[in-house]
């Protein structure tokens, strides 16, 4: 919702010859929409904007410092799942201690933790922890994000695809740096 792309995505799906059932559709609960009632209202808004009655994956965009509020939000996520408004639910940018809070709570575990993940940010501890609990890791920046300060005018160019080691490997195998990074992801699980 925060990216402002739901209307365009919905229009694209509606105008496409591809059936909705053949599209895996993910959207996110924005930070301002945490809490039980707000989360329930937010998914309904997203579904209306997307022009669909369900998403395949609904994600909490960012963990909250307030554990009680996070638990109320997760209660809403479970209801969204139970009501069929999402076929699976997950989180973004959660570290092991955030995931542990949901594990300790009991109930439905996140199907996915979507995080920045690439050869320069390998997230080994998180990947191991999530794997032990059956939580899939999905990269929101598989070819490398910006370096340094992240988003906006202070961000720096992607350094993964211009990494000399990745370039050397790409040259050795006659592939592009992007193909090498994708192969790394596949081999890393």
Predicted features and spans:
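Acidic-and-aromatic substrate-binding clefts and catalytic sites of carbohydrate-active enzymes
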Residues: 1-8, 32-37, 65-68, 117-123
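N-terminal binding-site loop/beta-alpha segment at the start of enzyme catalytic domains
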Residues: 1-23, 53, 76, 143-146
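Alpha-helical scaffolding within the catalytic cores
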Residues: 7-14, 42-45, 96-100, 120-125
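Glycine/small-residue-rich loop that forms an oxyanion/phosphate-binding "nest" at active or ligand-binding sites
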Residues: 14, 32-78
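Structured loop/turn residues at beta-strand edges in well-structured enzyme cores
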Residues: 18-21, 50-53, 84, 108, ...
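Extended hydrophobic secondary-structure segments that form protein cores and membrane-embedded regions
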Residues: 25-28, 114
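Beta/alpha (TIM)-barrel catalytic core signal, keyed to glycine-rich beta->alpha loops juxtaposed to Asp/Glu
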Residues: 63-189
């Amino acid at each position: 919702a925060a990216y402002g792309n739901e209307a365009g995505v919905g229009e694209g799906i509606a105008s496409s010859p591809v059936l909705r059932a053949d599209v895996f559709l993910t959207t996110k609960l924005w930070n301002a929409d945490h809490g039980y009632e707000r989360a329930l209202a937010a998914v309904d808004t997203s579904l209306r904007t997307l022009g669909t009655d369900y998403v395949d994956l609904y994600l909490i965009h960012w963990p909250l410092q307030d554990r009680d509020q996070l638990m109320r939000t997760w209660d809403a996520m479970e209801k969204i799942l139970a009501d069929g408004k999402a076929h699976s639910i997950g989180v973004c940018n959660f570290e092991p201690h955030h995931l542990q809070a949901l594990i300790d709570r009991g109930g439905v575990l996140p199907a996915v933790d979507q995080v920045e993940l690439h050869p320069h940010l390998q997230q080994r501890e998180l990947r191991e922890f999530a794997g032990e609990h059956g939580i899939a890791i999905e990269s929101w920046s598989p070819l490398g994000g910006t370096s340094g300060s992240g988003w906006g005018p202070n961000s720096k160019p992607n350094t993964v695809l211009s990494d000399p080691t990745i370039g050397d490997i790409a040259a050795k195998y006659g592939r592009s740096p992007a193909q090498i990074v994708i192969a790394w992801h596949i081999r890393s699980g």
